[in-house]
């Protein structure tokens, strides 16, 4: 399946001028005149967007510089050109003798489809113009239809099979080419192309059914529930939107200070919906049928092939050991929260599932006096971008420059385009920063691959292009965009993904950048969170936007310590979700209903009681995009923690460690087995116990001592 590896992952310095950064630019890349279009990155983000003269009068380029996409109709042209080229490449693949050229042709075929599909995948949700969104949606459907045809093209499959079946020829290929060939074959076989015609037809039908069920389930996860006003006490009704004689419950209201509001929202929002329950059951059983049809014992076995964990047994071992190590800490967290609830609400002091987010926040605020608004003046967006610039420059020799955009290149006038430039290698790629709030914009922070990097036949390198989407407030006339500590951490997180895309400079776009196993893809982004919480890094950029005063060390220390409050209970909740995901995608038919399984798993892996007549699993949207892989965030965090402690804790600006990180981890994208990359970075092969210990030990870090030692 040629688009399988293209799945998106469902989170700053002026002075050292462009001349120094461009000194190493040679050959063709120097022909482009860059000196007049690059500017310091911090300044570009601390000013309100303007309709610049060059933007109004300059050459019209189309979205992302694609000439056809200056109008919505251009998507039709782009997809027709892609489909025409696809047919030609299929003929080439089928007529070329088996060898390395086979893999190159397959990768070009994948690139041809992904360049339209990935771009359209972003535009269909990110563009403010409905005409562009609809045209992009149609392009996605058109490319998807072509992919289905290729998935059932036996001649194309056999051309790859001839290569993989020749042991001597495979041994002559380099490791990356072998892996990419095997990944293409894996993508084919999970769609059932190796089966007889009847089973192949069943596999195609199941794939279509799973896609439809996934879309239906995902859509309903956010549907509000209604209840008659008369059924709720009058004094809490104003917390909910009204619809005539009904109240609309559209979420859990987890931060509401009134216990009764949280309880009502929890019980009503999570009340079972029969259609959604049936949809989930059909989705899980269809996934299981497809997995068995193509040769796997469970969907989880199929989904975990090629990951760090490799098998469901390893995942459950990881989750069980982590749960065991967390259990005592979690009990203490729950006891502390119950004490706070008793203090504030003596009449109803039992801790319930709707309580932890609120009471952990109360404890955090009381103990550390963390008021986000006190931090914001020190964290202007421009300052944070300069901080990233300093960090990337010291660690990797990379500088970010703001680059002018042409008319039609961006979808909103507040988009910033960054050129990512290495001190000796030159231009590495582009990051489009869609950072600011606007109507109908998706609320989740995301990283999108628009174009993957690859080595082209003429010897030049196709530069990667990505979009980072955040939801930050706009600058005003009086002050720039100011970030809360949480926003700043999210910015660093998403920039971790972007750097992975820029530095995962593989020969093949099928494995470029973040196109890697899910439990490895979050490692670079989570690692950036550790940098964002280190005072030595923060002190480089966190200065008051008016006075220039640095953010006091004590404030950073308090913030970091506050993040450890109730972290065991929060992580225990994630373990519960991950275990539930594994059980749902394990042996079928399921022994009990999904709700009974939820109740048992919650009792085993969480500790707070199941609430009768609720079905939280029907709101678990990650079952669609992260089916059997929800554990990935925990495992990625464990790996990132180990890398931080082993390589960057002593010196977060260590250039040798930064270069090793690039060489061993980022450079391979998905072109190398993830455990081999981790082993190369850590100089050892970590065990499940090592992963568990890394996560638990994070809760012990004495940041106060650490900051004092770093003077």
Curated annotation (Swiss-Prot):
GO molecular function terms attached to this record: metal ion binding; metalloendopeptidase activity
GO cellular component annotations of the record: mitochondrial matrix; mitochondrion
EC numbers for this chain: 3.4.24.59
Positions that bind Zn(2+): 493, 497, 500
Cofactor(s) annotated in UniProt: Zn(2+)
GO biological process, one term: proteolysis
Regulation: Activity is divalent cation-dependent. It is stimulated by manganese, magnesium or calcium ions and reversibly inhibited by zinc, cobalt and iron.
A Pfam family assignment: Peptidase_M3
Presence of the UniProt keyword Manganese in the record: yes
Keyword Mitochondrion: yes
InterPro entries membership: M3A_MIP, MetalloPept_cat_dom_sf, Neurolysin/TOP_dom2, Pept_M3A_M3B, Pept_M3A_M3B_dom
Location in the cell: Mitochondrion matrix
Record's cofactor remark: Binds 1 zinc ion.
Role summary: Cleaves proteins, imported into the mitochondrion, to their mature size.
Family note: Belongs to the peptidase M3 family.
The protein, known as: Mitochondrial intermediate peptidase
Record organism: Mus musculus (Mouse)
Taxonomic lineage from the root: Eukaryota, Metazoa, Chordata, Craniata, Vertebrata
Gene that this sequence comes from: Mipep
